[in-house]
Amino acid sequence: MHAISLLNSWLERNAVIGHRSRQSALLRVVEALLDGGKLALTQLGRARPGNAFIKHHIKAVDRLLGNSHLHNERRGIYAALCATLLARAERPIIVVDWCDCELGRELLILKAAVPIGGRAISLYEEVHPMRRYNNPRTHRQFLQRFHQMVPAHCHPIIVTDAGFRGPWFRDVEALDWDWVGRVRNSIKYFQPETQRWCDIRSLYRDATPRVRHIGLRCLSPRHRYWYRLYLVRAYQRRPGRPRKRKLYSSNDGLYRRLHRAPWLLATSLPHQRGAGALIMRAYKRRMEIEETFRDLKSHRWGFALRYAQTKNSKRLEMLLLIAVLATFILWLLGLAT
C-alpha cells in the first residue's frame, strides 16, 4: 500500500523508532486500521495483513500494544508530528480538550490538536483516570510535555472550553503562549461602576450577534484573575424552525439553555482593531476537536474506539497512537489528490 510506504519514509526520516522490527510491526497495525479494522485488539488482528493464522495476528497486535519500548518512543513520534504540522505556522490555533473513552468513564483522553479543514489532527494526547479530570497538576504536566514538542518558532493560541479555568490560563501564560477560553456558570466579576461583585450571567442580557468588548475585568473574589472579556450571542434561531418543540428527555431543556447561552470569552490577547472577530473565529474552531472525537469513537463512520475494552492506560495510548498515524497519513493522501 502506497500510504504505508509514505508513512514508513516519514518515520525513517524523523528517526523516532529505535528498531526496524518495531517500526515494521507498527506499520502493519496501521495498515490493518486503514483496511477497515477497528481500534480493538481482535479487530486489528483480523485485519492485519499476512498469511498467518488469525490467532497469531491477534497475538502480534497484543505484543505491540504492550511494548514498553514503543510506548517510550511515543512522545518522539508526537514531536515529529508537531514539527511536520506546525513547520510553517508561527501563531497556530491549538485546541485542547478532555474526552471520555466510553469505558464506564474510567479512562479519559486529554488531547491537543490543530484544526485543519474541518477536523483537528492530534498533536499530543494522554490517557488519565477519572480522578485526574480537570486536575491542575495534570494540566500543568501536560502543558510542560507538550511545550517540549512544539517548534521553538511557534507561539500558539490555546483554545479551550469552559472546563479550563484560572490555573490553566496561568500555566499557559507561563509558557509565553496566548489563550482563548469561555467563562460560564456562577462566577463573580468586579463591576467598576457599582464597585460590587456581580454574577457574570448578568452580562448576558447585553449580548448581540456582534462581538462586544467588555474590557479588562477581575474575576473570582478569592483568586482575583484579570481577564479581557468579549461577549457575543453566537446562537441564532434558524428561519422556519418551530419555536416550541417536545422535550424528549429530562436533560433536553438543560442542553437547550446551554446551547443558546451567549459566549463570554476570555483571552490573554491584547485588544486591537478586529480582535473580537478574531477571537470568536478562534473559539468556533474548538468544535473541530469534537468532530475528531466522534470520528475516533464512532463504530460506523470512524475507528470505533468504543470497541476497545482495555482498562490499561498505556495500551489505550498505543491505540490512540495508531489512530493518529492513520489519520495523519490519510490527511497527507488527501493533500496529494
Give residue spans per PLM region.
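Short secondary-structure capping/turn segments at boundaries of alpha-helices and beta-strands
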Residues: 28-32, 47-50, 80-83, 96-100, ...
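Short N-terminal secondary-structure initiator segments
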Residues: 50-75, 236-250
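Active-site-proximal, Lys/Arg-enriched surface segment
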Residues: 58-118
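A structured, charge-rich N-terminal accessory region that forms the first stable segment of a protein
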Residues: 18, 22-66
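Single, function-defining residue in the core of a domain
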Residues: 1-38, 76-77, 89-92, 103-106, ...
